[in-house]
Amino acid sequence: MPRNSGAGYGCPHGDPSMLDSRETPQESRQDMTVGTTQEKLKTSSLTDRQPLSKESLNHALKLSVPEKVNNAQWDAPEEALWTTRADGRVRLRIDPSCPQLPYTVHRMFYEALDKYGDFSALGFKCQDKWEHISYSQYYLLARRAAKGFLKLGLERAHSVAILGFNSPEWFFSAVGTVFAGGIVTGIYTTSSPEACQYIAYDCCANVIMVDTQKQLEKILKVWKQLPHLKAVVIYKEPPPNKMANVYTMEEFMELGNEVPEEALDAIIDTQQPNQCCVLVYTSGTTGNPKGVMLSQDNITWTARYGSQAGDIRPAEVQQEVVVSYLPLSHIAAQIYDLWTGIQWGAQVCFAEPDALKGSLVNTLREVEPTSHMGVPRVWEKIMERIQEVAAQSGFIRRKMLLWAMSVTLEQNLTCPGSDLKPFTTRLADYLVLAKVRQALGFAKCQKNFYGAAPMTAETQHFFLGLNIRLYAGYGLSETSGPHFMSSPCNYRLYSSGKLVPGCRVKLVNQDTEGIGEICLWGRTIFMGYLNMEDKTCEAIDEEGWLHTGDAGRLDADGFLYITGRLKELIITAGGENVPPVPIEEAVKMELPIISNAMLIGTDQRKFLSMLLTLKCTLDPDTSDPTDNLTEQAVEFCQRVGSRATTVSEIVGKDEAVYQAIEEGIRRVNMNAAARPYHIQKWAILERDFSISGGELGPTMKLKRLTVLEKYKDIIDSFYREQKM
């Protein structure tokens, strides 16, 4: 985090006892509880010369003394199961098997403050050194931010929208929004000005937080169309010039000093667990984005029980260390990094904004997380990078890695639950694999999670070969994150784990193989879509069950297996229902040169076809795909007799590569369940899918409708030729 002069937060100049400045986050795990909280609260850990007084903490503690917290009763009138109003309330789905009383975000933070006040909460880089913020400092920064929002005119059940990369400011602004009675709303940093306008208008944003001038420019372009917007705060860079109602973070936090603590306390006292505190907007692939309303109970329940199901541990047992880098506007990252972090006293370290362009591995090495979450595409990129390095290694090192991964994969597939490893497996780990994990930053990582999209069998097998087991979670924005979780205790390859305690599932309209639509019920289920009653009624039935639109099956032990989206199910002209994902995965497994494969067959097409992209390197500055093939792709070409090193050398020209792909698809067809599942035509696209190209969403999930529209001419050509 670079120092900014007079704008936003730079490096602190306060008492060094307030904030540990060390080379690596690991050292900050030592001596976390030396001294009392009040002795350390002399200056802010992020602001220059801004005091966090003992009186402020004393006041906060008096507000939330254990007796007051434990005796507090939430107002639980007979409410409906859903609402579309930002100021509405809902009836909570409390299961007798897990009947914990609902509580608010403030109470969750207070309990963390009581147990973990002196533990490191947030870690960030400042002038190439890691700095740390304790939970006590974090709490008071959130309170000051809350008072700043009140001073700027934040109204009850209106939003503070945050448009910026993950940072301490994102975190304590989000918590401060909830404390102030507002609703925190994340906006993807890749959003256009028009997309920002839609979300800010829909959620009635009173304040928008931006991290850079680039993001500020987006808001300035649409401000006149945002009648509820009162102020913008920029927190990483100074504004280009002085503008009315545009504040630096330092100015914003100073505003909070003008609001009495009692004014904030009064708002906190009136908050109820069944009120909205978070809005998560869907990607909008099938229309305008929908605002998913999550209650305080959704957040506190999921942060506790969803994470417990994933074996996340409280800091008094072992402080979890995580790296925050995925977009916080997505529920998976927000619940995992922000809210679960508070629940269990985790240390959250922030990656650089260019994490997904290549710097993530450097942060992982420095931080050495104990648990880590990535969307499948992130894990695939790590896999491809390892494969590239291996291809460039000497013969002996490459053979050693292949041997070690082979014996380890075989052991993990044949005896997945066994702690007793054969000598050869232990030797392989000692000589080779432990060093690979250390180079990746996973030397201390005990839990590696993925979610938000399906993962290929190839990727799972690759990491099993490294002795890295990837645990799946299944959920949606509408389930506040995970409704099913895998963990070291509940793991089955290719499954999405078991139900989170207190949650329910049923499969409706099951076929002969037991596959049906997944319907969910429990404390994770969202309040409703903001201002969209028709969409809410489509999603939630009269008994309160959420219809996910996903198809899946349950095995005898309760493990869930996702088979695809019902909307993505391809219905051929012959009436066959074809789930695309298994076929796409089979093609990528058979052909290691393929980056993306998308099955085509919608609109009652007479046969299946497929669009393919090739694995290529990414531009280090933009993360856009280049024309250069990856080392793995070049190796594939050489194996089949091609000298190609770029995509353009292959598309429409390279007979050797085309023949190899044709043979691979023929092998996939031979293993298909029936002829209607065969891929009859295919094409290689000139450019890999990307976020900038529109084919991938912010979490790198495939946007099928966009692909169908963008490559309509190519797709139509498959079927025009059939008519001739």
From Swiss-Prot:
Q: Where on the chain is Phosphoserine found, per UniProt? A: S53, S56
Any one GO cellular component localisation term in the record: cytoplasmic vesicle
- An annotated Gene Ontology molecular function: ATP binding
What InterPro entries would the database entry show? AMP-binding_CS, AMP-dep_synth/lig_dom, ANL_N_sf
Q: Where in the cell is it found?
A: Cytoplasm; Cytoplasmic vesicle; Microsome; Endoplasmic reticulum
Q: Which keywords, in A-to-Z order, does the entry hold?
A: ATP-binding, Cell membrane, Cytoplasm, Cytoplasmic vesicle, Endoplasmic reticulum, Fatty acid metabolism, Ligase, Lipid metabolism, Membrane, Microsome, Nucleotide-binding, Phosphoprotein
Q: Where is the composition biased (Basic and acidic residues)?
A: 20-30
The EC number on file is 6.2.1.3
Positions of ATP binding: 282-290, 472-477, 550, 565, 701
Show the ranges annotated as biased composition (Polar residues): 31-51
Sites where Phosphotyrosine occurs are at Y658
The cross-references to Pfam families, in alphabetical order and at most eight, read: AMP-binding (PF00501), AMP-binding_C_3 (PF23562)
At the top level, the lineage of the source is Eukaryota
Q: List the catalysed reactions.
A: a long-chain fatty acid + ATP + CoA = a long-chain fatty acyl-CoA + AMP + diphosphate; (E)-hexadec-2-enoate + ATP + CoA = (2E)-hexadecenoyl-CoA + AMP + diphosphate; hexadecanoate + ATP + CoA = hexadecanoyl-CoA + AMP + diphosphate
Region (Disordered) location: 1-51
Q: Report the sequence similarity comment from the record.
A: Belongs to the ATP-dependent AMP-binding enzyme family. Bubblegum subfamily.
Function text:
Catalyzes the conversion of fatty acids such as long-chain and very long-chain fatty acids to their active form acyl-CoAs for both synthesis of cellular lipids, and degradation via beta-oxidation. Can activate diverse saturated, monosaturated and polyunsaturated fatty acids.
Q: What is this protein called?
A: Long-chain-fatty-acid--CoA ligase ACSBG1
